[in-house]
Amino acid sequence: VPGRQRLIRCGAITTPAGLPLPARLLQISDDMATLLRQFKPDAMAVEELFFNQNVTTGIGVAQARGVILTEAERACIPIFEYSPSQVKQAVVGYGKAEKRQVMDMTRRLLGLKDVPKPDDAADAVAIALCHARSASSRLSLLDSARPGSGRYAVRDNRR
């Protein structure tokens, strides 16, 4: 159906728990670079980082996120950031929706039998839907080739 989003593939990059942090970050970097080369996305949408109660986990997530953003920048892929309430608003229509509502609406919008698994992949699909459904994303994507546009300063190395 023209104009309707469809899920091509989703998943999560995982690393062995016993691996030292630098090796885990390198694996995430390598896996991300491979995915970006394979799928050649037009843009990357990420959720704003916030620390809940476990700061130690948050620091690890921030380090992994930094590696992922670096690989997107290296591949000249524009990066767009959304708050959790923006994702909820775009997917459900209510910025304070519960996680289960977001997951169910994600499933319904994409015509899926089940919610994507694992939870991190389901969250990523909802963030991608938020970007696709954001009216400004179409304009932002067109403007993203200009240095300094958008939430992040995006270099255009494709010239």
Residue ranges and their predicted role:
Residues 1-159:
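Phosphate- and other anionic-substrate recognition elements at nucleic-acid/protein interfaces
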